[in-house]
């Protein structure tokens, strides 16, 4: 079973409050996009990778090592960007299995991705569910403190 993957990196990162868009920020010597790609490229089942970028961010994209990927111009919203990538994907034969990931979230586990791929063999749709942790903590004086 083979897959194509859409890596969404076309957002404006408005909430991030930085001139440099979030997917291009580095942890160590790799951008968030490159960290995601490094993990994704470990999976032989993923045959085609589309990186959806914001046209305004091409100067950042050119500096990255985006091996084995095809760049696609994104839309105004995440939904538009996903749709544009899916339209490109339709043109490729035998590409019915699609994975979608947000480039600004590189801390996914490869174990989770393995499970998604495995479950895809038995199901037409797989959506991972992760437990969330509270962002509000109770301190010693029985008061709630918002952790940012």
Q: Where do the language-model regions lie?
A:
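Conserved core of the sugar-phosphate nucleotidyltransferase
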Residues: 43, 107-148
């Amino acid at each position: 079973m083979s897959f194509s993957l859409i890596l969404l990196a076309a957002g404006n990162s408005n909430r991030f409050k930085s001139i440099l868009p979030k997917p291009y920020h580095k942890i160590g010597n790799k951008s968030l996009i490159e960290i995601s790609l490094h993990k994704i490229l470990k999976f032989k089942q993923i045959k085609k990778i589309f990186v959806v970028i914001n046209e305004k961010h091409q100067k950042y994209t050119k500096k990255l090592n985006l091996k084995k990927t095809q760049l696609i111009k994104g839309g105004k919203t995440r939904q538009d960007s996903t749709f544009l990538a899916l339209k490109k994907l339709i043109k490729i034969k035998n590409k019915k299995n699609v994975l979608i990931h947000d480039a600004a979230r590189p801390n996914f586990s490869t174990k989770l991705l393995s499970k998604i791929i495995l479950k895809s063999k038995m199901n037409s749709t797989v959506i991972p569910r992760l437990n969330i942790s509270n962002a509000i903590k109770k301190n010693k004086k029985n008061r709630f403190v918002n952790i940012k």
